[in-house]
Amino acid sequence: MAQELKLGFKASAEQFDPRELVEIAVAAEEHGMDSVAVSDHFQPWRHNGGHAPFSLAWMAAVGERTKRVQIGTSVMTPTFRYNPAVIAQAFASMGCMYPGRIMLGVGTGEALNEYAAGFQGEWPEFKERFARLREAIRLMRELWTGDEVNFDGEYYHTQGAYMYDVPEQPIPVYVAAGGPVVARYAGRAGDGFICTSGKGADLYQEKLIPAVKEGAEKAERDFEAIDRMIEIKISYDPDPQLALENTRFWAPLSLTPEQKHSVNSSTEMERLADELPIEQVAKRWIVASDPDEAVEKVKFYTDCGLNHLVFHAPGHDQRRFLENFEKDLAPRLRKLSV
């Protein structure tokens, strides 16, 4: 049975100031997008020209200015500089104000954001970061019941805690995964799953999607009920040279996960990224000036079973991208099946 295809837009918080980013999200809804997602960084990946608006303030502002788009984080780390109980409160409040439109996308975190906000000591290994994430999700979901919560976990604790304003529709939690371990957990416990494009066909076909299915089956859940989101890095423009050059600002995406997770300053991230040649930077992106070529490359991801495509455009003229997307790409994409 074919599943509904959703088209979303990634609001580039590392690239635009808060007000401009709100206006871009409003434009995304006007141009037909089904969702808008925002990253949650305390520090951007670039020191020069970078931005880092607070995701929760942005989400509330976008909620007031829009009517139908889903609004969420892609992604937030609710485990170090944030107390997950407070994050639960924030998302419950937004869920009350914008019913059925708020989602919480979560990940295990990067050192860049946490050290700057006061984290001390050696950056935790993946095992601890993943354990913190699972525990944080359990705590938040308990709080969203509205019942008294006395939570005594390994990392987080509450005492006689109540969530007094709880939305009628539960807040869906989307789990970001770059490998099969977390992807299995997303299938087991997530309302949604998030991954990013441009990392090699076998990752999606042989590791991530099969792991989500495996997790869902073991938990006796319906795989089709899990919203499977992918951030698609796309630099589409009728001008081929502009399509290529637009990727330069986002060179940090082409660093290895090991480099990104351990770097603890924006200046160092920028230095490493700017050493990369434009050809290597562009490899993470679908760079296209022909709409049929662009859609054919996107089709790979729907063929893998991903049903919620969130498009991240690298250029500084986001309205130009949205106009071209609505005119050239959306009609073709809407014909794809999952």
Curated annotation (Swiss-Prot):
The entry describes its oligomerization and partners as: Homodimer.
Group of enzyme by EC: oxidoreductase
Which NCBIfam families does the record associate with it?
F420_G6P_DH, F420_G6P_family
Binding locations of coenzyme F420-(gamma-Glu)n? 40, 77, 108-109, 113, 178-179, 181-182
InterPro entries in the record, alphabetically? F420-dep_G6P_DH (IPR019944), F420-G6PD/mer (IPR050564), F420_G6P_DH-rel (IPR019945), Luciferase-like_dom (IPR011251), Luciferase-like_sf (IPR036661)
Reactions catalysed: oxidized coenzyme F420-(gamma-L-Glu)(n) + D-glucose 6-phosphate + H(+) = 6-phospho-D-glucono-1,5-lactone + reduced coenzyme F420-(gamma-L-Glu)(n)
Enumerate the UniProt keywords alphabetically: Carbohydrate metabolism, Oxidoreductase
Its function, per the record, reads: Catalyzes the coenzyme F420-dependent oxidation of glucose 6-phosphate (G6P) to 6-phosphogluconolactone.
Q: Name one GO biological process term.
A: carbohydrate metabolic process
UniProt GO MF annotations: coenzyme F420 binding; glucose-6-phosphate dehydrogenase (coenzyme F420) activity; oxidoreductase activity, acting on paired donors, with incorporation or reduction of molecular oxygen
What residues does substrate bind to? 196, 199, 260, 284
Write down the Pfam families for this protein, in alphabetical order: Bac_luciferase
Catalytic residues at: 41, 110
Q: This protein is called what?
A: F420-dependent glucose-6-phosphate dehydrogenase
Q: What is the lineage of its organism?
A: Bacteria, Bacillati, Actinomycetota, Actinomycetes, Mycobacteriales
Q: Which SUPFAM superfamilies match?
A: Bacterial luciferase-like
Any idea of its EC number? 1.1.98.2
The species is Gordonia bronchialis (strain ATCC 25592 / DSM 43247 / BCRC 13721 / JCM 3198 / KCTC 3076 / NBRC 16047 / NCTC 10667) (Rhodococcus bronchialis)
Q: Which family does it belong to?
A: Belongs to the F420-dependent glucose-6-phosphate dehydrogenase family.
